[in-house]
Amino acid sequence: MGVVSFSSTSSGASTATTESGGAVRMSPEPVVAVAAAAQQLPVVKGVDSADEVVTSRPAAAAAQQSSRYKGVVPQPNGRWGAQIYERHARVWLGTFPDEEAAARAYDVAALRYRGRDAATNFPGAAASAAELAFLAAHSKAEIVDMLRKHTYADELRQGLRRGRGMGARAQPTPSWAREPLFEKAVTPSDVGKLNRLVVPKQHAEKHFPLRRAASSDSASAAATGKGVLLNFEDGEGKVWRFRYSYWNSSQSYVLTKGWSRFVREKGLRAGDTIVFSRSAYGPDKLLFIDCKKNNAAAATTTCAGDERPTTSGAEPRVVRLFGVDIAGGDCRKRERAVEMGQEVFLLKRQCVVHQRTPALGALLL
């Protein structure tokens, strides 16, 4: 193979001398083009320009992969959000730990909002007729609430087990199919602004065991503080999801996330009783939660807050003075004073009669 050597001239052209001695004149355009291209490429110390261009391609590909599922958006904290649009308004479906879970949540919402012909992320995993009937039996707001609370799968499973797949509404589990666990009378702090329910320690460790880590194991202690999610079904067949954890600071077991909403919707007050139970039959040990109102406490609160009712038949007296109607608010007080005065007058009169005529006075008294 011949060796080629280059030499530049004053005119900017270059000549190539071959091994045989022949000179070949070469045009300066390629050199100028290469120099211009070299000026346009950024020069990074220790990194080749070609390598820099190649490393920028996976970033663009990753950005495209983040939106490969319909209705899924990445979150700054590493989680994935799901959303759907209804009449040009965004409906937020919640956040999920992975992209596939968010995509499945979007598919559920799409089936409820747009019917069985809706475009979904997983068309191969088509919903069954029973699931479509379950979606049709609930409103859009109810389905969105299930997705946000991550209880859709549990409610769907319970609904299909009870035969609600063909559009029937929720049927509560009968009392004879439940095994009572324990009861707890809520305190003012349980229904106050602390947004938590303290579960008695003996009942918590017996019925809701939670693995507690030693204080030396910081990772396990953090996981214990975060707690677990427990699903409960109320007397109306609605599923509630609470975060159940152990607080090292107070050494107590508590229900936190989801409890304030339960208190608000059930209208709980201090003195009411929470009843915990579980299913007595079947392979799945379902948990149940119910509340019993304290009617005595409610009546006491009502009487203390309300004014003394007036007689329905008696109307307030109105006096017209100088063309202005003045309602007498203390008419009843004046009537009571007059009645008391009449009683005192009659008593004095009876005493006088008794002094004058003892026999007649004794008869009157």
Swiss-Prot record:
Disulfide topology: none
Superkingdom as given in the UniProt entry: Eukaryota
Pfam family, one: AP2
Known DNA-binding region: 68-123, 182-294
Region annotated Disordered, chain positions: 1-24
Subcellular location: Nucleus
A molecular function (GO) term: DNA binding
Keyword ATP-binding among record annotations: no
Major location category of this protein: nucleus
Keyword check for DNA-binding: yes
GO CC terms in record: nucleus
Keywords from the named record: DNA-binding, Nucleus, Transcription, Transcription regulation
Name of this protein: AP2/ERF and B3 domain-containing protein Os01g0141000
